[in-house]
Regions:
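Charge-dense, helix-prone N-terminal extensions
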Residues: 2-165
Length: 165
């Protein structure tokens, strides 16, 4: 295609290598390193099953990793047929055909456990939500995790209809 006399030459190269911010952003993933998002939340590709959840937990920074391992163990111990997945950079736990009952997410100073039908749990987890049924339980560094209470919540939550996105 011929250019007219007043046409500007293209400043775009035909085959430009990835450079700049975009290349730096992609580089860690090439090397197999996990990118930590805002608040230190691991960026794990979405996927079903235990493997992506374990990858998420392994990538949790510092003291939060131990909390992730303990939460996962409590859930598996109390709901042996639990279904696991990583969605929206968070591990999800559910029952096949019933939906998701629990998720957790890493923030800068705490790990937030989400009970999708938490308003129906007894006692009700303390963290409120703008969603009527959802309740949260935040775990901060140095907090003692009451595994017995967490197990009671997990059993109750797994018995309820779950959240289906």
């Amino acid at each position: 295609m011929a250019r007219g006399r007043n046409a500007k030459p293209s400043t775009r190269s035909k085959a430009s290598p990835k450079t700049g911010a975009k290349a730096r952003k992609l580089e860690p993933r090439k090397r197999g390193k996990v990118v930590l998002l805002s608040g230190g939340n691991p960026q794990i590709p979405k996927g079903d099953g235990d493997a992506p959840v374990q990858a998420y937990i392994a990538a949790m920074p510092g003291w939060k990793r131990a909390i992730g391992k303990r939460l996962d163990a409590v859930i598996v111990r109390n709901v042996p047929d639990v279904r696991k997945a990583v969605k929206w950079n968070s591990p999800f736990y559910g029952i096949e055909g019933q939906g998701w009952f629990l998720s957790f997410h890493v923030f800068t100073r705490y790990v937030k456990v989400t009970f999708f039908r938490g308003a129906s749990l007894r006692p009700v987890p303390p963290g409120t939500s703008k969603h009527e049924d959802v309740r949260y339980f935040d775990i901060h560094e140095g907090d003692e995790l009451d595994e017995a209470q967490m197990a009671r919540w997990v059993k109750q939550a797994a018995a309820l209809p779950g959240w289906v996105p």
